């Protein structure tokens, strides 16, 4: 009986100290400086100055004076995913009160037209509003799905062609592609076996026998039709 009383007394003492410590910790936490670490600076880098400032201002509206400990990547995703120039990003918390957003800009691959308006095609699979650009990019004709263009570009990258040598790409409803190189040679490709056809076309374009030809037609299996018109 005495042992049972001792056990009850010990249990009571343990519970008392636990309650006391919990109360103490909660009071300490509520007065802690950690809860006063409010964000007062968000630095964005990776795009041009105009875009960096614009994104930074959007973040400041959303996150200014919020506690840095309670900010997660999800707070940034909605804003950053709206910007088609962004390929990827990293967010760094710099304690006590700053955040850095490092952006990797998408690569501009080509130019195309949608509803009589020009757009860049980005490596992130998105269309980007067209503006002046100091690099020559190929023009893509036809109603393309961006993912189909990117897949075709990957095939070109595996071939002997350099993508920078291509000035125009034509996409047809059947799913077939034509390309024109910087020398003005139009290459009509088959619907299948594109890599093989591209490598054959490249060999023809550098062959002296075909130096005056302007059209290379590879649409028919095992046939090469070339003309100078």
List the predicted regions and their residue ranges.
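Charged, solvent-exposed interaction patches on well-folded alpha/beta domains
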Residues: 1-229
